[in-house]
Structure formats: structure tokens, C-alpha cells
């Protein structure tokens, strides 16, 4: 593995078992993560400890849900989720850079009861999930999977903290004692159509908003990572997850750790499933740099980013940042989260 981003040709694979079980050479694992974050912001993880049977149940129940007719899926439409921003959306309802993505999906988050203080206050992105009434296996798998991912997210953020020369508890002490955890299940139809003079992407070029994304993908492939030399494929690796850092970690590290653009297209003759889990700062956490910003890095960030917007100019809480993004992804839900 190399630190120089221009020489990145593939996404590295890192065994994180030392972080998960909190034994062995954690510093070595943290160093590998640090090199990957500086080079491309993307890396596979193995040795993560997430039960393979749970992953199979999640995939099987998800396929059952998406195989239903549209009317049945719309019974848990996002419009019914209100300020919690949960539920199903059909193909074309989600936008990236103002263009409709060729995918459908379900949005989930931490399951919170109506009497939870943040739900009672009406804080957006907090509340109960919407689950299909006739697929209890999906509910069980989603909630168990989110618990496992949250635990894994804490372990990985400890490794990222150590990779930066910080105490392992740095992020938990300041940002993720109560992380904003968001989970998506996406289904990409197998018949992508051309739009105008180019392809219609499952997800167009974008970066993620928060700290860390942990992605489970099926064996169809299609994820691509942007590099100075072009787009690098990130094909499926058995029993691995793809991790990438988000805009807030890019901001915190003054661009040393890169929130790298990526995109998705369907490369096979069948539908593709993906399962991104977002481990993000607390909604009310004010995002501040860990180190002094390097003006050169900040300038090159603006020039290179897909949206020509520097994350290093952002001031405010993570809630401020993600709500501004929500209004662009789902314009029709803007009123419910404002």
C-alpha cells in the first residue's frame, strides 16, 4: 500500500480483527487504515466479526421485499415517515447532483420510541422505522444488523483515532458517544437506460456526508472510486465490507483523510443490492478541525470535488450539514425536515 494518491490502482484489504477483539497489534492495523485514508479514503475490511448468517438473512429478506409490487412497497413510503426520514422510495425518487438515480431503496435509522427526548422535540432524522407488515424477518435482520454495525463503527473509529496519533476514545469523547446511525438498503434494476448523451447511473458521482461508511455489497459489483488517474473498480470481496470516510472526517483532518467521490452502475444482467451503513457524528455535535488546516489542501479540495464546494468552509453542527444535503436528495421531503 502507498500513501501517494496519484499511484492508487486498487482498494486495499485490511484485517481489522485486532480492533474488533481489542487484542493483537492494533497500532499496525491503525497504521494500515491511516495509509488508506490518506491515499484514497477507501479500504476493504475483513476480520470484522459480523455474523455471516445474519448477513444472509438480511440479503434474503431484502430481496423478498423488493420483489413485491410497487403498491405493497409504497405502504411504507418515506412520506409516511415524516421528520424521521425513514421508509421506502421508488426508482427515480432520489437525486444525486439534481439527477434521478436508477435505484429504489429503504431508509432506516436508530429505532427510537415516541417518548424519546429527541423524538418528542421533533428533531429530524430521529424516530421509529417503517417496516413491511408481512415480512417480519426483514425487521429482525435490519435491527440486529444495525446493532452489529454500530459496534463495528465504534471499533473502527478507535482505529482511525489511533492512526491520527490521538487517544482511541477521541471520537467517542467528542462526537460519537451517541452517533447518528443511518442505514440504507438499495436495489438497482438490471436494465439501466441511457439518458441524453450518457448512462443513467445507479448512483451518480458523490461523496458521503459524515464520518465513516461501512458498505455491504452483493456479488454483482458496480462500485467505482474516483482517483486522479480515473475510476477504480471496487469489486465484491467475499465476507468483506467496503469502508470510506465522509465529508466530516475530511474536514476534521484538514483534508489529510479524503472524502473521495464514488459512483455505482449495474454491470450485470440482474438486480444489484447494496447495504450502506453510515456511522456519523451526533446530530448536535459542532464539527471542528483536529489539526490546523493546510491552505493548499483546502484549495485543492474545492477544485477536485464533484460539487465544487469545500467542506472546510462549513461551520456548524452535523445536523446543519446533513439537513442541507437531505433537501437536495429528496426535495419533496424538505418541508418535513425543516
Model-predicted regions and their roles:
Residues 1-97, 102-103, 125, 143-144, ...:
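C-terminal flanking tails of non-heme Fe-dependent oxygenases
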Residues 18, 109-110:
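Residues that line or immediately flank small-molecule/substrate-binding pockets and catalytic motifs
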Residues 110-141:
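A short, charged helix-loop
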